[in-house]
Design a protein with these regions (language model features):
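A residue-level signal for beta-strand positions that form part of recognition/binding surfaces
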Residues: 35-38, 52
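N-terminal low-complexity, intrinsically disordered segments
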Residues: 51-61
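Exposed, interaction-prone extracellular/peripheral surfaces
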Residues: 1-30, 38, 43-48, 57, ...
Length: 293
């Protein structure tokens, strides 16, 4: 199914497929919605979820009513996409998908959820040494702007310098939720430092680390030449003897990423781009929701 979704250029179509059956949102906002704390009833309207219908009241009143709730807080949602050259790494198991495709599709789904909840949401893209913004706003038109920017993103160059990122953190002055998707091959890095700084500014930071199964298992072809796409260091040929060293270093690196996130109370979820996208999205949101309780 992931391979089929990768063939379409219609990001909205992919979003509809992924979000079908996803039964929860990003957070609790102040506008009325299907929250936990019961507030009042209102008449059923087309598009309401059937699980919110009060069937006992239907039996008494012979009309459909849905339960509403007053949600707790209202914060902006920011999507942060790493669109540097390393995100072009493709799956060796599923044709047509790479890290960037997976990252932008997951973030597009988060944007769609935010739009459904009535939240303001914006987009930050790190690519080719610069930062690109889509300012936070609400509504269907904003969703179209964000989807267009995500669709145009190409995996190019390296991360912006630390001073450039630091100078651009003004976008999140008010308390915000920040959903960042990257391979986090560099940590510490200008990106990780910016995200940690945002967390220290009391923003709710939630990270998604994307890897390929080949990266995890080190199932690279022996003798083939590999080049770091973000550094000009020539070709590296991985022998069989190099594999175990690679695995150890890779394991240590991502354990460091996980430990740093835990130490700073940052939600962190690691996924393979070969996994079903809907399952990754659901797990990431549930992990974030569990911390919020």
């Amino acid at each position: 199914m992931t391979a089929m979704m990768a063939q379409t250029k219609d990001l909205e179509l992919v979003i509809r497929h992924v979000l079908a059956g996803l039964g929860h949102g990003i957070h609790a906002g102040r506008e009325r919605g299907a929250g936990v704390e019961f507030s009042e009833y209102r008449a059923y309207a087309p598009g309401d979820e059937w699980r919110r219908v009060d069937w006992k009241l239907l039996a008494r009143a012979d009309r459909y009513f849905v339960r509403e709730a007053e949600r707790d807080s209202h914060v902006a949602t920011w999507l942060w996409l790493d669109a540097t050259a390393s995100m072009a790494e493709p799956s060796r198991e599923i044709n047509g998908i790479d890290k960037l495709w997976f990252a932008r599709t997951v973030l597009a789904c988060v944007a769609a959820i935010a739009q459904r909840q009535g939240d303001a949401f914006g987009l930050v893209i790190c690519t080719d040494g610069k930062v690109e913004f889509t300012q936070a706003s609400r509504g269907p038109r904003q969703l179209q702007r964000v989807l267009a920017a995500l669709s145009k993103a190409k995996p190019e160059g390296s991360l912006p310098p630390a001073d450039v990122l630091k100078a651009n953190l003004h976008f999140a002055r008010a308390p915000s939720m920040i959903f960042a998707a990257s391979d986090f091959l560099d940590w510490p890095s200008p990106l990780s430092e910016a995200l940690l700084r945002l967390r220290n500014m009391r923003h709710d930071v939630r990270l998604l680390t994307l890897r390929t199964q080949a990266e995890v298992d080190a199932t690279f072809k022996s003798g083939s030449g590999y080049r770091d796409p973000e550094r000009d260091e020539g070709l590296h040929r991985m022998s069989n003897a190099d594999r175990e060293i690679y695995r150890q270093r890779s394991r240590a690196h991502f354990e460091m990423v996980t430990g740093s996130c835990r130490q700073n109370n940052i939600v962190h979820y690691e996924a393979r781009i070969e996994q079903p996208l809907s399952g990754v999205l659901r797990s990431w949101l549930r992990l974030a929701g569990a911390r919020a309780k």
